């Protein structure tokens, strides 16, 4: 720790009324920062007012800075009073006074411009941010056939604007703070004031304020610092890149955490069923959506249990199979030198390797690697009598079922649970299969997220089952979805009024 910084990495000292002291301090603190731009000049009729301007090259809008700040100050008719800066600059720039060097340097490193005046024990902060960023693009990770196509970017302000564009309500609040003692990353909590539960909001704010770490660079990191129960493989927060999903979640009383430099937004609290919901579920008719959701729940059971079920049947209980199926199983396994458990684990781990390789390879090559690699490896393993054709089918169906679930974080938990069930079934057969599923369900029922049961609406404490299940496995018609979820503020759960024609 140097003599400029505190133990929490904040800068010491206040702004000096002597401009040379401020120049010396800034030059020392920002030593070897070649992207720092420093300009010293004098203004006024007789050039009697000394100014010192500081900003970071590449982080500011230099054209705006020149037109709105520097050019008005350099006018020959500029009066002698320092307070005249207000009249010349305030009208054309967003600004405020700051008193400490910590505020000044943080502002500069955040893309703002700081102006020091000789004789003033404070400085002027001008908002001049212009970060290099990509534009709004299609949501490539959460593809929807119908509905909006835009997605979040790495810009905090652009992301909040995408949400604000969809909710034009004065009660939509944006609380902006910083996190990370060194990175000082901006983040914003967004919620609707009359829908959010205040105790949940306060808990989240307290947790965010308690985080003391060098830097937070993505919401995936922030999620791990916020979670209270790190012993569960199931995600306790939802990440999304779709503004429409965030907007609809906020209008259900949930809270969005928008982090600068992250193209994903964090939503909380969450329940088990939200991970089975896709954005276009609400843009299609309820019959289609209900059918697809039932398929997703079936796919979840298949992705967790099918390999383990095969191990249990083939290794312990072949007698439960009808004779034609049993003969087919014996014929398929003829010549395979490995026991069933080794056979299944070999193919499952091979598929996981192919999946990881496909993710890491660039562009279209990754998808090609997954398809072609799977075909080649599977066929070669069957031809070499290392695995049976039935195992290849089981692994392929499991993979397809996993990809049918619309949330990547959630499917990662299912992939781990799959191996958990395979091991149990290898030791205890069908008893291990049912015991494993029972353990998973008990675990889900005991989880909670900021006081909200994770298994909601299957765990319903207040007896409102008719309203709790309106957006579960069966998605009601939009006209009948009259109530918001249980984690909405008490007294604000009516989403739409009764239709007089329906009475």
Locate each region found by the language model:
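Hydrophobic alpha-helical segments embedded in or immediately adjacent to the lipid bilayer
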Residues: 300-320
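Generic detector of multi-pass transmembrane helix bundles and their immediately adjacent loops
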Residues: 309-312, 322-503
């Amino acid at each position: 720790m140097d003599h400029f910084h505190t133990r929490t990495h904040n800068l010491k000292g206040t702004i000096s009324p002597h401009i040379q002291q401020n120049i010396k301090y800034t030059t020392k603190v920002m030593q070897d920062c070649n992207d720092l731009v420093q300009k010293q000049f004098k203004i006024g009729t007789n050039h009697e007012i000394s100014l010192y301007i500081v900003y970071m090259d590449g982080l500011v809008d230099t054209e705006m800075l020149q037109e709105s700040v520097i050019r008005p100050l350099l006018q020959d008719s500029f009066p002698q009073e320092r307070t005249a800066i207000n009249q010349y600059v305030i009208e054309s720039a967003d600004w405020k006074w700051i008193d400490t060097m910590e505020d000044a340097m943080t502002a500069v490193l955040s893309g703002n411009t700081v102006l020091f005046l000789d004789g003033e024990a404070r400085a002027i902060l001008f908002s001049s941010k212009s970060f290099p960023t990509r534009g709004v693009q299609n949501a490539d990770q959460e593809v929807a056939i119908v509905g909006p196509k835009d997605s979040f970017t790495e810009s905090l302000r652009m992301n909040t604007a995408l949400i604000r564009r969809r909710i034009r309500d004065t009660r939509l609040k944006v609380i902006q703070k910083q996190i990370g003692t060194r990175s000082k990353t901006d983040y914003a909590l967004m919620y609707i004031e009359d829908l959010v539960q205040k105790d949940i909001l306060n808990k989240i704010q307290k947790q965010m304020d308690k985080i003391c770490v060098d830097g937070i660079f993505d919401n995936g990191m922030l999620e791990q610092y916020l979670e209270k129960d790190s012993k569960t493989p199931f995600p306790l927060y939802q990440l999304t890149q779709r503004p429409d999903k965030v907007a609809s979640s906020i209008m259900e009383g949930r809270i969005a955490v928008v982090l600068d430099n992250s193209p994903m937004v964090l939503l909380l609290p969450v329940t088990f069923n939200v991970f089975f919901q896709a954005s276009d579920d609400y843009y299609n008719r309820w019959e289609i959506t209900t059918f697809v959701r039932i398929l997703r729940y079936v796919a979840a059971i298949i992705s967790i249990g099918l390999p383990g079920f095969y191990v249990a049947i083939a290794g312990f209980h072949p007698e439960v199979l009808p004779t034609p199926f049993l003969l087919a199983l014996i014929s398929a396994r003829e010549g395979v030198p490995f026991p069933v458990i080794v056979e299944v684990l070999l193919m499952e781990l091979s598929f996981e390797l192919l999946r990881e390789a496909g993710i890491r390879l660039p562009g279209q090559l990754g998808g090609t690697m997954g398809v072609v690699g799977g075909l080649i490896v599977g066929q070669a393993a069957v031809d070499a009598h290392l695995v049976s054709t039935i195992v290849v089918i089981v692994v392929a169906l499991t993979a397809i079922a996993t990809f049918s679930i619309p949330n990547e974080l959630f499917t990662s938990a299912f992939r781990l649970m799959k191996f958990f069930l395979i091991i149990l079934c290898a030791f205890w057969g069908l008893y291990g299969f049912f015991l494993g599923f029972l353990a998973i369900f008990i675990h889900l029922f005991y989880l909670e997220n900021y006081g909200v049961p994770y298994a909601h609406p299957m765990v319903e404490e207040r007896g409102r089952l008719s309203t709790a299940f309106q957006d579960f496995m069966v998605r009601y018609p939009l006209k009948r979805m009259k109530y918001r979820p249980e984690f909405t503020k008490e007294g604000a759960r009516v989403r739409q009024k009764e239709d007089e024609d329906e009475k």
